[in-house]
Amino acid sequence: MTGKSVLREAREVQLAVTLIGLGARLQFLEQEVGLSRERRVRLYKEIKGVSPPKGLLPFSADWYMTWLANIHASMFYNIYRFRAQHADSELDALVDAYKMYLSHVEVQGGEAVLDFTRAYTLVRYFSSKILETTACVRCKGNFVTHAYE
């Protein structure tokens, strides 16, 4: 009898709980977690207390170019690049970097501009070479820019 490992399923549920807690949408969970849609929806409702949001994921790289979004996106992506060098997987790097981003914003007394979905989309845009970072000539910080500009 072949069945799903109880330990593997427990890890999948824990991963889903972590991702939902960070604000991941069902479309993201579908790609990263091997649970059925029904279980993902039930988990989401149990954790958030509401039905999951419907609609499309963000699709415009231009959103990251406004000054406040750019500062937050640049901060997150620089954290992500560092974490990606030391993480076991891209997903671990994404989760760790997003937690560090939220922690940094909280310590500074600010509000997070980048939600988890936008952070994930940002990483995808870099992987697709739609966005890149460019160093500022004054401060030498790396900021998110459109590729090929």
How does the language model describe each region?
Residues M1-T18, L22, L26-Q27, Q31-E149:
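Long, charge-rich, low-complexity intrinsically disordered regions
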